[in-house]
Amino acid sequence: MNCECETDYEYHEFVECITSALDARDPYTGKHSERVSDMACFIGELMGLTEAETQEIHIAGHLHDIGKIGIPDRVLLKEGKLDDEEWKLMKKHPEIGADILSKSSHFARLAAIILHHHERWDGKGYPFGAKGTEIPLGARIIAVCDSIDAMASKRAYRNALPLEVCKAEIEKNVGIMYDPEVARLALENWDKLTEVYR
């Protein structure tokens, strides 16, 4: 799957530099962000968003985990599941990322997407418990792509899950964790969306 978004966005090279810096600290996050970015761009195109909207979501995909730069190594790089205190720290990364980006007027809309990318359609996400269309569309798209990549990728504490299992999890959470329209588009275009994992 090739994403056409990056060629026309004036900040794309700068964003890739930031992602590379994060990649040097946590190799998983860098490659993860690249895959999420490409999937989010693809879904934006399927939804018929404007070129500018799709580009914005593509860039937000690259930057959605930038807040992890503020998470201590003992938590970010831990080989194993996080305990309650560590998880509490990890859950701060959307706010840290949004705070970093909101310092520039160029990235204000991106900051809103990044702030909400762990919210859930049913309001049980974080950091604010926003629900439904209270969550920016870009964040709702990234939430689906982020989950797919988290499940389909090998982690320090587990192997990658089979794509059939990942698909079943998305299906199970349509209208619960995920925006129904976004999730259904992902499911209807599953093979194309997940070709990078095959």
Language model segments and positions:
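Metal-dependent catalytic cores of enzymes that make or break cyclic nucleotides
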Residues: 3-198
